[in-house]
């Protein structure tokens, strides 16, 4: 089966989304898949070493044009992020972070191959409690800011 990863980074608030790494994988036991509209996407890696061994026909594209071919998926992903970060730096971005989502490499892969140190927060087990806490924190910050405000609101 053929798969791809979008190698997107945020350059401040702008998305640099020129790069795609495509590859083939015959043995799917090393990955977790999710499907949408008849297509399958990798959402997790069960066995990184096996995944690296099994991935083949690895190609990096920029805006649809082939940039390079690789024998190793880890090297391809590192190179793709290096190029994407270089483009973000060229644009003058101060804050550059990888995009995480549908079609992007899973967070555990990004942590492994991204050239800078990253730590992702785990998805909360109790989403309702997490969202309640955020709402309370934002409300408290907003209330405290209004107390310090010298201007009269209209």
Swiss-Prot record:
Protein name (database record): Uncharacterized protein aq_194
């Amino acid at each position: 089966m053929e798969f791809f990863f979008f190698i997107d980074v945020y350059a401040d608030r702008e998305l640099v989304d020129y790069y795609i790494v495509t590859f083939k994988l015959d043995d799917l036991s090393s990955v977790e898949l999710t499907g949408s509209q008849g297509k399958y996407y990798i959402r997790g890696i069960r066995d990184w070493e096996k995944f690296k061994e099994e991935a083949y026909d690895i190609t990096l594209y920029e805006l649809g044009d082939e940039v390079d071919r690789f024998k190793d998926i880890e090297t391809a992903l590192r190179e793709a992020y290096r190029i994407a970060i270089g483009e973000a730096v060229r644009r003058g971005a101060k804050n550059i972070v990888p995009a995480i989502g549908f079609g992007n490499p899973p967070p555990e892969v990004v942590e492994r191959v991204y050239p800078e140190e990253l730590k992702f927060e785990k998805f909360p087990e109790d989403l309702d409690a997490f969202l309640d806490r955020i709402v309370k924190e934002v409300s408290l910050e907003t209330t405290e800011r209004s107390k310090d405000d010298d201007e009269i609101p209209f």
